[in-house]
């Protein structure tokens, strides 16, 4: 007889429970076109989901690298900032540096394995790539501004060293580990991570741009917020394709939970007052962004909040077409968004 206290014995029960959960999950997956296994997943053409493919091409057209961001003018600005401003910016960067890795963990561990549609897999693959660029960019910014190795190490380990960053990270990580939640619930949760958890921090950095500070930081923020806007739009598109969507009540519960955590983060734990922003208006802005996300998911607003920051008009979640028609800082890869017929090669030109 095996000892019931031994890990192996406990593991069998856990495996059995896990197997039961997996069977239920597989039954639900077969009802979802996005999750249904098919040999079609190995071949991209012919395109079955043109709107999903179009978003993949938008992501591709917007590719950039950390080396393309000029940080040479930032240090003189950084050295003139007040201690509170330096504290706020460095801690925001620490949060961001950790967060992109968590988003990627979800894409690698869950979404890329669950979704069977090749067009969506292409998008997720490219999202993983650009999230790595974001993470590198934030790490490079910390490396550039923070000269003290101990402070730098503290910031790079934000999930362990900063309780308020850990709280946000734990919320996201819990969704990755949750084997009972539906795919739809997790799509909403990670739309909240990229649409709500990032929104206030993006706004804080755009506030610095309004003041004419830190051109390298604010330019990278434009590029990253544009990317995250597309990722959030993509999550909403995937949600629209689901047959078994979570209820409006459940979706609201997930998003309102994220709003509370983000409001606490930027008005209590790391208050935007440190850089001269109004904490009450920041709370309102986070509610405004959450309402926009709910509408894009196909539901009604919860907060009925107006956008209190005029400088964020083109950066809000409404940016689905705005972002890409505006072409932030003219950063779009040439010809990627052109129709295939526009790129025909011929030999009949006169030389």
Curated annotation (Swiss-Prot):
Enzyme class: oxidoreductase
Disease: Mitochondrial DNA depletion syndrome 8A: A disorder due to mitochondrial dysfunction characterized by various combinations of neonatal hypotonia, neurological deterioration, respiratory distress, lactic acidosis, and renal tubulopathy.
GO cellular component: cytosol; mitochondrion; nucleoplasm; ribonucleoside-diphosphate reductase complex
Binding site for Fe cation 2: 131, 194, 228, 231
Required co-factors: Fe cation
Entry's localization field: Cytoplasm; Nucleus
Residues reported to bind Fe cation 1: 100, 131, 134
Stretches for region Disordered: 1-32
Organism: Homo sapiens
Its job: Plays a pivotal role in cell survival by repairing damaged DNA in a p53/TP53-dependent manner. Supplies deoxyribonucleotides for DNA repair in cells arrested at G1 or G2. Contains an iron-tyrosyl free radical center required for catalysis. Forms an active ribonucleotide reductase (RNR) complex with RRM1 which is expressed both in resting and proliferating cells in response to DNA damage.
UniProt GO BP: 2'-deoxyribonucleotide biosynthetic process; deoxyribonucleoside triphosphate metabolic process; deoxyribonucleotide biosynthetic process; DNA repair; DNA synthesis involved in DNA repair; kidney development; mitochondrial DNA replication; negative regulation of intrinsic apoptotic signaling pathway by p53 class mediator
Annotated active site: 138
Induction: In response to DNA damage in a wild-type p53/TP53-dependent manner.
Name of the protein described by the UniProt record: Ribonucleoside-diphosphate reductase subunit M2 B
Lineage: superkingdom: Eukaryota
Family: Belongs to the ribonucleoside diphosphate reductase small chain family.
InterPro entries: Ferritin-like_SF, RNR-like, RNR_small, RNR_small_AS, RNR_small_fam
Pfam families for this protein: Ribonuc_red_sm
Gene3D superfamilies membership: Ribonucleotide Reductase, subunit A (1.10.620.20)
């Amino acid at each position: 007889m095996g000892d019931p206290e031994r890990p192996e014995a406990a593991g069998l029960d856990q495996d059995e429970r896990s197997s039961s959960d997996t069977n239920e999950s597989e039954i639900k997956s077969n009802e979802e076109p996005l999750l249904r296994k098919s040999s079609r997943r190995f071949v991209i053409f012919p395109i079955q989901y043109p709107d999903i493919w179009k978003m993949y091409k938008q992501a591709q057209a917007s590719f950039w690298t950390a080396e393309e961001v000029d940080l040479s003018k930032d240090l003189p600005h950084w050295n003139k900032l007040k201690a509170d401003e330096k504290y706020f910016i460095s801690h925001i960067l620490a949060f961001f540096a950790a967060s992109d890795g968590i988003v990627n963990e979800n894409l690698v561990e869950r979404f890329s394995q669950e979704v069977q549609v090749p067009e969506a897999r292409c998008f997720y693959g490219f999202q993983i790539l650009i999230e790595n660029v974001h993470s590198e960019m934030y790490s490079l910014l910390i490396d550039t501004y923070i000269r003290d190795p101990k402070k730098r190490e503290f910031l790079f380990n934000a999930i362990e060293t900063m309780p308020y960053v850990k709280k946000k990270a734990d919320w996201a990580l819990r969704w990755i580990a949750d084997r009972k939640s539906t795919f739809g619930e997790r799509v909403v949760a990670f739309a909240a991570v990229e649409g709500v958890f990032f929104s206030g921090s993006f706004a804080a950095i755009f506030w610095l741009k309004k003041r004419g500070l830190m051109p390298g930081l604010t330019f990278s923020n434009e590029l990253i917020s544009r990317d995250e806007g597309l990722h959030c739009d993509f999550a909403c598109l995937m949600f629209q394709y689901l047959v078994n969507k979570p209820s409006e009540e459940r979706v609201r519960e997930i998003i309102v939970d994220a709003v509370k955590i983000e409001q606490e983060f930027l008005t209590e734990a790391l208050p935007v007052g440190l850089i001269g922003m109004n904490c009450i208006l920041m709370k309102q802005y986070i509610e405004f962004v959450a309402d926009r996300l709910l509408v894009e998911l196909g539901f009604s607003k919860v907060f009925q909040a107006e956008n209190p920051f005029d400088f964020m008009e083109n950066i809000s979640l409404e940016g689905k077409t705005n972002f890409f028609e505006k072409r932030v800082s003219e950063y779009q890869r040439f010809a990627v968004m052109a129709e295939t017929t526009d790129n025909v090669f011929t030999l009949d030109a006169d030389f």
